[in-house]
C-alpha cells in the first residue's frame, strides 16, 4: 500500500488502517490473491504495449500510479483517445483513495460520448 498509494510517507495518509485490512481480507480469506495478480503477470509477460486499442478510450493519469502513460504513448497505442487527463492526487488504487475524483473522471469521459 505504501508504494502504490498517494501518501506522504505513511499509507494511512491515503487509506485508513480499517480500509486496508478490509481490502487485504477480501483476498486473504477466500485465497484469491494469486488469481487476482494473474492479470498483472499476463500483461507484463505479453508486453503492456503489444495491442493497439482502436476503440475510443479515456485515460486518467494519477500521480502515484505505478505506470503513468505519456500523451505521446497514448496517441501511439490508443489512436482514438476521447479524454486524457493528468490529475493532482491518487495512486494505483485511485477509485478507492479518491472515489469522488475517480467518479468525476468517469462521468466527464462518458459525457463526451453521449
What function would you assign to each model-found segment?
Residues 1-114:
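C-terminal subdomain of alpha/beta-hydrolase-fold enzymes, centered on the catalytic histidine
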Amino acid at each position: 500500500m505504501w508504494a502504490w498509494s498517494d501518501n506522504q510517507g505513511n499509507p494511512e495518509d491515503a487509506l485508513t488502517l480499517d480500509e486496508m485490512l478490509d481490502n487485504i481480507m477480501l483476498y486473504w480469506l477466500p485465497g484469491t490473491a494469486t488469481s487476482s495478480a494473474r492479470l498483472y503477470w499476463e500483461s507484463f509477460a505479453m508486453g503492456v504495449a503489444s495491442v493497439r486499442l482502436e476503440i475510443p478510450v479515456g485515460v486518467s493519469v494519477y500521480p502515484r500510479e505505478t505506470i503513468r502513460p505519456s500523451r505521446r504513448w497514448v496517441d501511439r497505442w490508443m489512436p482514438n483517445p476521447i479524454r486524457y487527463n493528468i490529475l493532482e492526487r491518487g495512486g494505483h488504487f485511485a477509485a478507492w483513495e479518491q472515489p469522488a475524483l475517480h467518479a468525476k473522471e468517469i462521468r466527464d469521459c462518458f459525457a463526451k460520448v453521449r
